[in-house]
Amino acid sequence: MPTKQPMPPVPPLQPLLFWETGVLLFVAGIVTARFPVPALTACALFAWVDSRTRRPLCCLLAAACVIAGWWIGEKSVPRVPQEYPAWLEKSLSSRRAVTVEGVIVGSRGLPDQRLQIILDDVGPAEKEPLPGRMALTWQDMPDVPRPLPGQRITADLKIRPVHGFHNQGTWNSEAYWHRQGVFFQAWAKQDDAAIRTSGTPSAGAELRERLRLRVAAALDPPEESGLRTLSPSSTDRNASRQAALPSQNAWSEPPSPPRREKLPSAPEQIGEVQTEEVREHSGSPAHSAAPADTRRFSRVQDGGASIIPALLFGDRYGLNTPDMERINAAGLTHSLALSGQHLAVVGLGALALTGIVGLLAPGLFLRFPAYSLIGLLSLPLASAYLWLGDAPPSLVRAALMLAIVCLLRCVPDLLPERFRRNLRPAFTFADVLLLALLCMVLADPLCLYDLGVQLSFSAVAGIALCSPWLSKLWNDGPLSFSPLKVLQGGLSPMRAAGGRFIRLLWLTLGCSVAAQLATLPLVLDAFGRSTLWFPINLLWLPALGFIVLPLSFLGLIAAAAGLEQAAGFLLHLANIPCEALLHSLRWLQAHAGLDLFVSPRPHWTAILGFGAIAVALAMRIHRDHFPHAAKRLLISGALLLSVGPLLWVHAFFEPKISLRVLDVGQGQAVLLEWPYGGRAMVDGGGLFSDRFDVGRDLVSLVLTANNLPRLDFIAVTHPDRDHLKGLLFIAANYAMKAAYTAPLEGIDTPQHDSPRPLSEAFTAILASRGIPRHTLGAGNVLPLADGLALEVLAPAPGVTPSGNDGLVFRLVLNGHGLALLPGDAEAPYLRALLRSGADLSADVLVLPHHGSAGSLVPALYDAVSPKLAIASAGAYNPYRLPSRKVRDALEWRDIPLHITGNEGEIAVHWDLKKNAGKKNILQEGFPPPRPHLSQYVQPMGRARESSPAGNTE
């Protein structure tokens, strides 16, 4: 009798069904509304790979999917209001606070003790409300109950329209907020805004807040929370409960209005994933001296205890920026973002409940499989976690996939036998993933632009594509074994257990690497930085999944049941690995340099190419050769990956000089670019915030867009925060030949006062990296290329500038002035420059001191005679820059004025193609090139009109 041949393994990645191709085309169609070229390129890729789209009927269906997606994408674009209520117009002109009230529709805790509140129907009493929602960021709130959804809030706020940073090729927080329907923003600190709440919160929000307070009370140190014994008396238990929870009417009775103080100014600008920033204020919080046992509502845990509320509720109020940066540098940020990994604890809970059911009614398993019961019981638990964690996109994705699997696999077991086969279709992982994507897109088409959604789906897809390769590598390796060997005595149980443990470590590390690789293009595109420390996931993820999360949920259940002592015991046990993690990361930072590395940001074609090649390689597993579709994917991926380098080569040889004044808020950062890859930064911007680094989060993203982190040099006109702070990150992470400054007080001239802290930090970074720093003065010339140079016009030799005065640069081409960069030079300094007789003529004038009246010298405008002027000033800045006097002086001379706060990044190009046929494209003897203006966005008329006519700053 012939032996039966074993079945060959089934390839894990099957061809997509046509409806799945339609889903991908529909999604690409939605993206077409905002990014037409990348989306249509993706559509062409799908159509070329899937041969079915060349059939007439399928081609029509595919086109219909794309058109339907485009139509939905266009209809979903938020309509930004163009007209504001009269009371807001008056407030924007006067820069004064206005008393408003609104309904709370959402709130969440942010790091550094910030509470973000989303308000609707905002406006003064009996006046027209704002057209849209408003985001209020409240830092260091006093010890009062948190404002909750459903309540009304009254506050004295300086409201302004949402405005982000508009720079070519970078993210913009403005688009993020507009997708949420938020068009206005405000900030408050402590009790400065006299915030008062009234009304009763929604039942769900109130219950969630009560649970959060119970967990916070249980996480307090034993001497503060009353957890002194494991068997407290009833009196102690009740007292502890009363100390941890607000009274029944705590949310319905508004506290007495706090004392009014000077309102904090809005920050110059806001960021994205760091989306809102509060200006630093001197002085300690007003509630810092309050005894610990009286701080019932705003309990803030230090260290690892702040991680547990983030895992349970998505509340990061107690975390601080240094710890968050260390977690990010270690590649562990995803472990705090509620997702499928956290939802796995729901499976453990469902498994425990199934075991209890089996003990109470074992006969149930004769009719209903245990695995189906586990799946069905996990659904209500997952829904509860969605509500508890405030439903972030990654958790919604995981819950949807769980629900789809249960619907397709477990629900048919509830039906009679004759219906099960027909109602239990075969499905693959791709089916589940695309169904979840379709559900989320139909509910909110704009979720496709959410970075969290993109990272979540990319990570899961990457794990699914790499898992077969991980299994194959393991099975072909020396540590693989068969359970049959254990039963036959060929392998000891201890060795088998060790093999299973090593396999678990292998899969954990492999899945972590797969998720990192799958999300790497998106991470680099969004942040321009990555980490090599992701192997720490090998230690942290098992501890998180098997210790921290289960104990945290058990502690939450105990706290909800009123078992304070048991809750405190469980939560403090869960806190041990969290504390160990933070201590380990601090040690690594101190001894091993726990830092992110800066890398080039890929062109968008590289993201598509990377995905195409990853799918093609996954299609090769368990096949003798690449299928036809995989070959097309490999060809497409290779072509797409080559686009970015080809564009870089084109830009390298392009005969063009560029001056780009970046949108960095109330600051200044100028990027100079010239042929053959020459680049230099003159100033780098800088804000008050310690969370949002202009150099790291704005300037670096511009510099690494399809380019290397490299500069020829950096120059600082003067060491003020809004010019120098952004260069600290650039100096610490970029390759460069030199740095140029004016003589620095206290460093180059020790007889002066002590040096500024930023100057000390800057020179220390340069010294540690071996970058030479040169001091410049009038008469120095920095050659950039043949015929192109940066002249130094001030300070005079032997003069150490002080205050806002510093270096004055003039960009020249064969003696023709292209641009004048005077920094923040004040009027007396500029008059001295005029008296020196230096040639100041230039096509472009970057206004001194952001257009301040203190730097207004009309004779300078006459001497420069520019074709256009640029003011680097933030929108709605508190200094009302550029001033009305400067605007009038420029208008009288017919000099066009462009403002970065209104128009975003402003780039001026000088095209040298007329000389391209010559050996030296910058040689003399040709007419000087004409400047061409490139604006990132259309001018914002409302911001331009925000300064009143009577302003004389």
Model-identified regions with their sequence ranges:
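Di-metal (Zn2+ and/or Mg2+/Mn2+) metal-binding site signature of metallo-dependent hydrolases
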Residues: 332-353, 710-734, 845-859
